[in-house]
Amino acid sequence: MENIDMKYLHLLAKQYPTIAKTATEIINLEAIMNLPKGTEHFLSDVHGEYSAFEQVLRNGSGVVKRKIRDIFGDELDDAEINSLSTLIYYPEEKMDLIAEEMDDMHDWYRTTLFRLIELCQYVASKYTRSKVRKAMPEDFAYILEELLHENYNEEDKKMYYEEILQHIISLDRAAEFISALSRLIQQLVVDHLHIVGDVYDRGPYPDKIMDTLMNYHSLDFQWGNHDILWMGAASGSRVCAANVIRISARYLNLDILEDSYGISLRPLALFADEIYKNDPCTYFQPKNEDNLNYSKAEITQIARMHKAISIIQFKLEGEIINRRKEFDMNHRLLLQMIDYKKGTIHLKGKDYQLLDTHFPTIDPNDPYKLTKEEKELIEKITASFKNCRRLQKHVQFLYSKGSMFLTYNGNLLYHGCIPLYEDGTFMEMKLRGENFSGRELLEQFEILTREAYVRKPGTKEKKYACDIVWYLWTGAVSSLFGKSEMTTFERYFIAEKETHKEEKNPYYKLRNEETICKQILEEFGLDGECGHIINGHTPVKEGKGESPIKANTKMLVIDGGFAKAYHKETTLAGYTLLYNSYGLQLVSHQPFTTKEDAIKNETDILSTRQVIEMEINRKRVRDTDIGKNLNEQATDLKMLLEAYRNGSLHENS
């Protein structure tokens, strides 16, 4: 007792003023700690593909269907299991289809309600009543609690529950009740969601994904390289805004800016039509990967916009490189390496012919200087990003729930990499005059990313932080990028593929080694023997023999593969991860078709499970980070109880 601060116990006594209340809370905490660990669900690299993301989120990477098989495997055939699964994923839409095929829904409602209640009882069994109650929709909370926490086999209660269900059906509330049960099941099968980066990129609906995540019951977020670009644009970074628009134009995805976020691109269109009106912009034709129906005139205008914003981007990047010598990026000052008369560029000791030599806004004597019109344009565009309420709401959520890395239940989560030298030591970078590496480097990157958003506009601190955010997108020591350089200019203007090459950081080779992974885990304060690294960012090319499980299971690469462009390379849609009380399971997914197909034909994403690590003893809440906090609370309360019993403190009944 000598080491316990009595002031703290006095404060604790205000919340627990009696022996009875203190003892009750200790019992409650011990009971919670003995419950099975909740299921963690890991997703990465969603890339704006809302339909596939929604399906994986609703089915819990196959957890819902597995729970149905646990309960009804001997009672229902595969078709019935698929039908019940689809109902839980999309209750309203599925019931609409069923209602079209049935004249009388009464018996179907009754059977379905009983099945859903039984399933809900099963998935709720690992939680406290209090937690389940909080997850229930308010309208049905009382009835749900009655139905979920009683035994149907007791004859004296059976009729009571039959009557409840009969009234739900007769009062025409069965559909709403089924929807409520379905959503409750979805919520209870996954206790916590980890998004290991990149909601944003080339996909059309990152905004819908963000809306969904903002309504999710429990999650965290590790920022990805594409997320950081949008965060930078929302923070007021001109170069990040230019990059966002360039990528959107390249992949025919300007609708996300104009329709979803209300960011007007009319000033850019007018500027591009004027400056590049006689330019075919051949090498800036957008990629129409989804065969979208655009007219020739629309494609021509988008190509002009694409080129216009690209040139502005290259100029802005040159400005940053020139003022931030510590970024060590002089080799990326490409506009000054062009011979504008010959139409060539001198790179790494060799001259290359440029594919496009029409640069009406570039002054060869001062190539990084924006024209008056370009400057006005990028200021307008950046202001639109800053003033977009919906984007600001989404970015604020990314800041509030996100981080550069996360340690959680003994595992280390990050999107890109931990920058390493060839010998496996941590790469250093100088930030604000001081060298950082490893964990400290990522912590500094996070601090500066937050400063970019909150610092006052016009200050040197704001400008520096915004420049760092851009560096995180493209820099050699960025933990989000993980390559030596980003050869965007070369891909547009030089035919020779040798100039397009981007050398990966040694990390991507070294992460196959168990000793390196253990070293990284220990750098972040985790147990190298028990912990795992959960990494996104790089698609796993299974067709070429790559495996998502590396370094004797220390490294798990879970690029979700949602981006359709990578499906040919990977031969599947990617991976997600589950971590429940029984251990770690990697889930591989086949490509998703459509939501309509999933509902009508009851097609789910075909998933294959691979057990990575099976627990000998089932993990309990006490074995988790939350459990450690609960255990500390219980220890403090036991000290308080002892103080009451030995007379150090007196009860206040």
Curated annotation (Swiss-Prot):
Record pathway: Carbohydrate biosynthesis; gluconeogenesis
EC number per UniProt: 3.1.3.11
Superkingdom of this protein's organism: Bacteria
UniProt GO BP: gluconeogenesis
Enzyme class per UniProt: hydrolase
Pfam families referenced in this protein's UniProt entry, alphabetically: FBPase_2 (PF06874)
Listed cofactors: Mn(2+)
Keywords: Carbohydrate metabolism, Hydrolase, Manganese
Reactions the enzyme catalyzes: beta-D-fructose 1,6-bisphosphate + H2O = beta-D-fructose 6-phosphate + phosphate
Entry's Gene Ontology molecular function annotations: fructose 1,6-bisphosphate 1-phosphatase activity
UniProt record similarity statement: Belongs to the FBPase class 3 family.
Protein name: Fructose-1,6-bisphosphatase class 3
Taxonomic placement: Bacteria, Bacillati, Bacillota, Bacilli, Bacillales
